[in-house]
Amino acid sequence: GTQATSKVRFDFKFSNWHNGQKMDMNDILHSLYFTMEWGTQTDENDKTFDVEFTPIASQAVQTIIGIKPVDEDTIDVYVNYWHFDEGEIADWAALWSSMPWEISAAMEQSVIDGKASFSRSGATNKNVSWISLIIPNDAQMIQSYLNDFSEKKYIPKSLESFETDFNYFDSRYTASSEWVEVNNHAVISNGPFYLSAYSPESRSITVNAFDDETYPFKLGYWSEFEKTKFPKITNVYSPDIIQKGTELEINIETSHADSILYFLTDSNGNSTLSELI
């Protein structure tokens, strides 16, 4: 089988989308599908190619070896990427979605049908609109696709192997379609604030707090980042006289640090030794 350089396991904290639907693994899987599908170009007639997005997405596609859903909120991601800092590997392999899969699917279909584009350059080249979920006309187009998906009992190929109950898909289509009907935009996400209203005429946007009990990060959760604690060397204990050929011991006291990078230089200022401890 194919070997990967690194494996990262993600345990997601899912909450409700702003339209009330529960975020789930299908949102993650469809997001990955989108990156893989739009990050490659099979030929010059490939309809899932965008002049701006595809070159960017292709960088991630080249390193993703595979994924393995473990349970309803856990997934293993295999990538050909390594870094001495494991946090960097996790960041590189991270999968997430900031919108429900059905919104992404409707956007994709509108672009494939030639009604819109994912980028400014693509819109200019094809003489179509640069799709924006906040613009009422584009939102109504998305709503039309959602209603069509519901009527035709459409199940995205990206999710066929993971979910078969059409009631689930229909509830997603209906909830997002109703959101557009009420709010006149299709911006649905999962953060602590949601877009309540947008008026192009008055150039005004109304944003409200998303007061939902499923949101995982309660008030004050991120407060520790408000006061940054910088690493600092508080004291250094070293002998006044150093004798050549004898062992040298230097004690260093620090605060808010878990490692120290030290280096030694000779009389000419050239570095002779460097090590992270």
Question: How does the language model describe each region?
Answer:
Residues 1-277:
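The feature preferentially marks the first beta-strand/turn patch immediately downstream
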